[in-house]
Amino acid sequence: KGFNEVSEKEVIDFVNQSDNDDLVYYLSDAAYINIKKSDGKKRSVRSDLKEYAKKGIEVLKEQIRFCNPSVILGGDVCYNIIDNLFDWGEELYGGDGYNPVKIYELVIDGKSYPFIDMFHPSRTQNYKDGDEKESMSMYFLELFKAMISVEKARPGYWSSHMNNKCFEASALK
């Protein structure tokens, strides 16, 4: 079996047979947290990110409330950046390895949002499995492995967190 009991073949088969009731659909309502623009620089420094997050935490929370995402994707920002700035529910998935995927529940005003924290997509050129460099497909493979693992452990988890989009008429009634 593969990583966390989910094999690469299972992920590929899953993606190939996806329809609107699958995890690909849930990602279509994802919000990607961008704590700070890097001013055109290639890299951000973690200590700078932490300061930007502290200064902008209320704006960030308000953006999450407004957008009401079904999933939030963070680019490796939990540990030592936003971990003490939000309320957190339980850790749903704790990956391991060079670039681990972690899935938490972030809580704002008593509402829980699945928060997937993994390396930023711009780091895909740096993703290594041993001596072999991986492509962007590896990024999505790791993401789907984690999501499928959560779904196996908690059937119906992802569908239970589908939120109304902020611009849907039904959300305004």
Stretch-by-stretch model annotation:
Residues 70-71:
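Structural motif
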